[in-house]
Amino acid sequence: MKKSIGLVGDTGRMGVLLTQALLCRPHCFLGKGFSRRSQTSLEEVVTENDILVDFSSPEVTSLLLDFLLKTPRPVIIGTTGFTNDSGVKTKLSALSEYVPVVVCANTSLGAYVQKRLAAFAAKLFSTSYDVRILETHHRAKADAISGTAISLAEAIRSAKAESYEEEPEPFIEMHGSRLGNVCGEHEVSFVGEDERFVIRHEVFSRRVFSGGVLLILEKIMGEGLPKGYYTSDVLYESLFQEKVFG
């Protein structure tokens, strides 16, 4: 049976791309969506769809989770920029007790590969190397340091802690720029006295993000993800294992 997919933020950049992509999918169909200007309520979108995909705003995501906790549905959260006191993380954790919850700051394969390489490099370069993360996005993006950049920093810190068997206190320099209509650029640099090692990922089209969402949807619908909290890395990790070691 075809699954109904509800888009929250269906008139935004990602929402429009996903709408176009979902119209061509054989195993699902586009259900009622929600935007700030839509006549459909958020509660309707939750109750009348099988799976929710959210690319909206932190405020709307928080409200969406309130409804999902009453009527649990599998959900993919692509919204970023949550504050620590917003309560969203607590709601996501609670919802994951009932259904699969996939939280993804960046759904592109390239972003996953960059993170893997950055973590690997962090294990090899000593703490004498300075680490810098630069990110650039379009001027309308709300969060000043992107979720992807934060995720990169977390991966580097985790790798160094594992490598040196204790939690280090390295300073990771982070910079964010908001320029024009840039889809997304992330650069990680390891800088020593005599060399600089750079890992750079640049997105030319948001289609790469919608393609990642479709892969996650296929995993939810095809394999029947069990309830739990996931990131897009989980999907790409299985792909990585298959391609490299399979």
UniProtKB/Swiss-Prot annotation:
InterPro entries (UniProt xref): DapB_C (IPR022663), DapB_N (IPR000846), DapB_N_CS (IPR022664), DHDPR_bac (IPR023940), NAD(P)-bd_dom_sf (IPR036291)
Q: In which pathway does it act?
A: Amino-acid biosynthesis; L-lysine biosynthesis via DAP pathway; (S)-tetrahydrodipicolinate from L-aspartate: step 4/4
Q: Which residues bind (S)-2,3,4,5-tetrahydrodipicolinate?
A: 138, 147-148
One GO MF term on file is:
NADP binding
State the EC number(s): 1.17.1.8
| Residue positions binding NADP(+) | 37
Enzyme kind, highest EC tier: oxidoreductase
Q: Which GO terms describe its biological process?
A: diaminopimelate biosynthetic process; lysine biosynthetic process via diaminopimelate
Is Amino-acid biosynthesis given among the entry's keywords?
yes
Which chemical reaction does it catalyze?
Answer: (S)-2,3,4,5-tetrahydrodipicolinate + NAD(+) + H2O = (2S,4S)-4-hydroxy-2,3,4,5-tetrahydrodipicolinate + NADH + H(+); (S)-2,3,4,5-tetrahydrodipicolinate + NADP(+) + H2O = (2S,4S)-4-hydroxy-2,3,4,5-tetrahydrodipicolinate + NADPH + H(+)
| NCBIfam families registered for this protein in UniProt | dapB (TIGR00036)
Q: What is this protein called?
A: 4-hydroxy-tetrahydrodipicolinate reductase
